[in-house]
């Protein structure tokens, strides 16, 4: 069993992508760093390129062992869903290009893991992230969701290990 594992949680978005790095060592979860990427560019393709560059910089700087990425949820607007899917593809590509395995989680699974219900509000998720990590949640909502994805994944790893499946 590894002495510690570092996970980057990512909440993809075409306007704002939240990310959070959480390390588990001896069963203790620690916030390493977190932030939000607001890609810039003259058009959508340029913004996707900027998202890739900025996220690749984060991955290089923190060298996570694994990535927990929030899956695309059903959007009411088809065009919005397509853009979100493209942003998510960029996120997966940035992780894969740096050898970081990507594990997908539905938003409802992440919420249930942190709050106990898959229909929790972002504020509730952010509050619980702060409680789990022992910090005051002063980050953007997308960043809180990304940290929640990382925590959800670390908890899944621990449960799998305890069940003797890993």
Curated annotation (Swiss-Prot):
Active site as annotated: 11, 70, 142
InterPro entries, A to Z: RNaseH-like_sf, RNaseH_sf, X-over_junc_endoDNase_RuvC
GO cellular component: cytoplasm; Holliday junction resolvase complex
CDD domains per record: RuvC
TM spans (from-to): none
Sorted UniProt keywords: Cytoplasm, DNA damage, DNA recombination, DNA repair, DNA-binding, Endonuclease, Hydrolase, Magnesium, Metal-binding, Nuclease
Superkingdom of this protein's organism: Bacteria
UniProt-recorded Gene Ontology molecular function terms: crossover junction DNA endonuclease activity; DNA binding; magnesium ion binding
Localization in the cell: Cytoplasm
GO BP, one annotated term: DNA recombination
Binding sites annotated in the UniProt record for Mg(2+) 2: 70
Cofactor, free-text remark: Binds 2 Mg(2+) ion per subunit.
Catalytic reaction(s) noted: Endonucleolytic cleavage at a junction such as a reciprocal single-stranded crossover between two homologous DNA duplexes (Holliday junction)
Sites where the protein binds Mg(2+) 1: 11, 142
Cofactor(s) it depends on: Mg(2+)
Main subcellular location of this protein, as a coarse class: cytoplasm
Enzyme Commission number, as recorded: 3.1.21.10
Family, per entry: Belongs to the RuvC family.
Quaternary structure (record): Homodimer which binds Holliday junction (HJ) DNA. The HJ becomes 2-fold symmetrical on binding to RuvC with unstacked arms; it has a different conformation from HJ DNA in complex with RuvA. In the full resolvosome a probable DNA-RuvA(4)-RuvB(12)-RuvC(2) complex forms which resolves the HJ.
Function: The RuvA-RuvB-RuvC complex processes Holliday junction (HJ) DNA during genetic recombination and DNA repair. Endonuclease that resolves HJ intermediates. Cleaves cruciform DNA by making single-stranded nicks across the HJ at symmetrical positions within the homologous arms, yielding a 5'-phosphate and a 3'-hydroxyl group; requires a central core of homology in the junction. The consensus cleavage sequence is 5'-(A/T)TT(C/G)-3'. Cleavage occurs on the 3'-side of the TT dinucleotide at the point of strand exchange.
Protein name per the record: Crossover junction endodeoxyribonuclease RuvC
Lineage, opening ranks: Bacteria, Pseudomonadati, Thermodesulfobacteriota, Desulfovibrionia, Desulfovibrionales
